[in-house]
Amino acid sequence: MSNENPNKIKTTSNIKLKSYYGKNNPGEYPFTSGIYPRMYQDKLWTMRQYAGFSSAKKSNERYHYLLRQGVSGLSIAFDLPTQTGYDSDHEISDGEVGKVGVPISTIEDMRTLLDNIPLDQVSISMTINSTAIVLLSFLIVLAQENKIPLDKLKGTIQNDILKEYIARGTYIYPPKPSMKLVTDIFEYCSQNMKNWNTISISGYHIREAGATAVEELAFTFSNAIAYTKAAIEKFAQ
């Protein structure tokens, strides 16, 4: 290991790195330098693999396997019918059930999916948008059934509906009511699930849909600004 003084480390551009930067230190409001005092030096990133198999049972088996291998969190991939609000037995779901992720139509499916997984110990990420409020509700019910306080749940729900209009197309409702659902999640979690990340704003899908790097950044930040404004309006009411 190097004996170099960490306070004298420089970047490849010969810029000296500090432990902390300016008056807005990491872990302090407004958190522009990070949400933890020492960031990854004390708290490593959550290690998780995006996964969702053709059934809740098979997906559950995979999650237990991943946890045995040492992942520190789970990342749930849902199939297209689940993403767009269709039950697996709906005629429009024919041919798509379980293709790109796990099908979840009912609370019973969710019970099977997360069977014997300690929800108060394992961070869970759910990549879901237009039906985010439904899947989050399922998770809340499971926690309540297992007598787990909601403020003990840790994880993230993508809840990034605007990029669905721009890139993926898995929206259900017009933008205005969809944004209300987004901010309803903000409101509920801020009051009941303090350790839950209520949105994950994504640019990757926009780039994959044909945007340039500049357009990807522009759309992503404009979405973030729109969510921020919607949240301010919500909490000002």
Can you say where each PLM-predicted feature lies in the sequence?
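Catalytic alpha/beta active-site cores
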Residues: M1-Q237
